[in-house]
Swiss-Prot record:
Biological process per Gene Ontology, one example term: coenzyme A biosynthetic process
Phosphoprotein is among the record's keywords: no
Organism of provenance: Corynebacterium efficiens (strain DSM 44549 / YS-314 / AJ 12310 / JCM 11189 / NBRC 100395)
GO cellular component: cytoplasm
The reaction(s) this protein catalyses: (R)-pantothenate + ATP = (R)-4'-phosphopantothenate + ADP + H(+)
Binding site for ATP: 113-120
Main localization, broad class: cytoplasm
Protein's UniProt name: Pantothenate kinase
Region (Disordered): 1-22
Skewed-composition ranges (Polar residues): 1-12
The protein's annotated pathway: Cofactor biosynthesis; coenzyme A biosynthesis; CoA from (R)-pantothenate: step 1/5
Alphabetical list of InterPro entries matching this protein: P-loop_NTPase (IPR027417), PanK (IPR004566), PRK/URK (IPR006083)
UniProt family annotation: Belongs to the prokaryotic pantothenate kinase family.
């Protein structure tokens, strides 16, 4: 039996700097855009404008340098997952589709981050970009807003002022929905949420029918718990990150824009804010941020960042400046 290696044998060669044992690979924007390789631009300026959220300035350069490389990475991971399916079929000795009808298993992506950070735009961009790959053209996007308890139920529970916190969601219904889709079920329904009414739309649903990829976007989708959580079903996840001070500013700027647009709708829940001046609107937005959105970010959302497969870090101009990707 060979003698065990001694400490001197095991020690790495001196390199002048400590080895990097971080679980992440860290890229600046210039390094990340090189990973696009030869991928062509597949979106037009008009499409980017249509996908852009309030207060954001995403353009074709941002798509080319940030989101095309990300689309390529996810595409490669989807292909790898499909190869695993083939390996399972080889083990079973038959096509899983013949042995288990309806066994189509989609690749599930979670997109998380704070209010106003731009996660919805990221999710929409990923949906469109991933649809352009011929090997997985069916990409569905569902937001967790539809799984918020109805306003009446939130009032009954006394948590209307905790809307957006983990306890305000019907976690069991969300988990059941993603489990059903992941299990290959046909025509799985998700509730629809109205930002105008600030509530679920009674009797209205979207139907997800065996997509190649499902994107689940929401504040708390990377939450963990003592039992199975929706994050346990993700094959890949993205966390959209930024400095807290920048997110607060974006939130206030968005609130002012909504005051001049969506809040003016006759049925808008926040119609009473439509006619207030800039100073008052800014004060209201800052109070909402400080009392609700900031505590939720600090207590519940930000701690889940470490669970993401990839972190998009934005600078003050709302554009991605760094990308962190998990090695493991």
């Amino acid at each position: 039996m060979a003698a065990p290696l001694n400490a001197q044998t095991r020690a790495p060669q001196a390199t002048g700097r400590a080895p990097d044992f971080s679980p992440y690979l860290d890229f600046d924007r210039a390094q990340w855009r090189e990973l696009r390789k030869s991928m062509p631009q597949v979106l037009t300026e008009e499409e980017v404008v249509a996908l852009r959220g309030l207060g954001e300035n995403i353009d074709l350069d941002e798509v080319a340098e940030v989101y095309l490389p990300l689309s390529r990475l996810i595409h490669l991971q989807v292909n790898a997952r499909q190869e695993l399916t083939v390996a399972t079929e080889t083990f079973l000795g038959t096509s899983s589709a013949r042995m288990f009808p309806g066994s189509h298993v989609p690749f599930v992506i979670g997109v998380a981050g704070s209010v106003a950070v731009g996660k919805s735009t990221t999710a929409r961009l990923l949906q469109v970009l991933l649809q352009r790959w011929s090997s997985h053209p069916r990409v569905d996007l569902v937001t967790t807003d539809g799984f918020l308890y109805p306003g009446e139920e939130l009032q009954r529970r006394g948590i209307m002022n905790r809307k957006g916190f983990p306890e305000s969601y019907d976690q069991r219904a969300l988990l059941r929905f993603v489990t059903d889709v992941k299990s290959g079920k046909f025509n799985v329904r998700a509730p629809v949420y109205s930002h105008t009414a600030y509530d679920r739309v009674p009797g209205k649903y979207i139907t997800v029918d065996q997509p190649d990829i499902l994107i689940v976007e929401g504040l708390n989708v990377l939450q963990t718990g003592p039992t199975l959580m929706v994050s346990d079903l993700f094959d890949f996840s993205v966390y959209v990150d930024a400095r807290t001070e920048d997110i607060e500013r974006w939130y206030i700027e968005r609130f002012l824009q909504l005051r001049d647009t969506a809040f003016r709708h006759p049925d808008a829940h926040f119609r009473h804010y439509a006619d207030i001046g800039d100073e008052k609107a800014t004060a209201v937005a800052r109070e909402i941020w400080q009392s609700i959105n900031l505590p939720n970010l600090v207590e519940n959302i930000l701690p889940t960042r470490v669970r993401a497969s990839l972190v998009l870090r934005k600078s003050a101009d709302h554009l991605v400046e760094r990308v962190r990707m998990r090695k493991l």
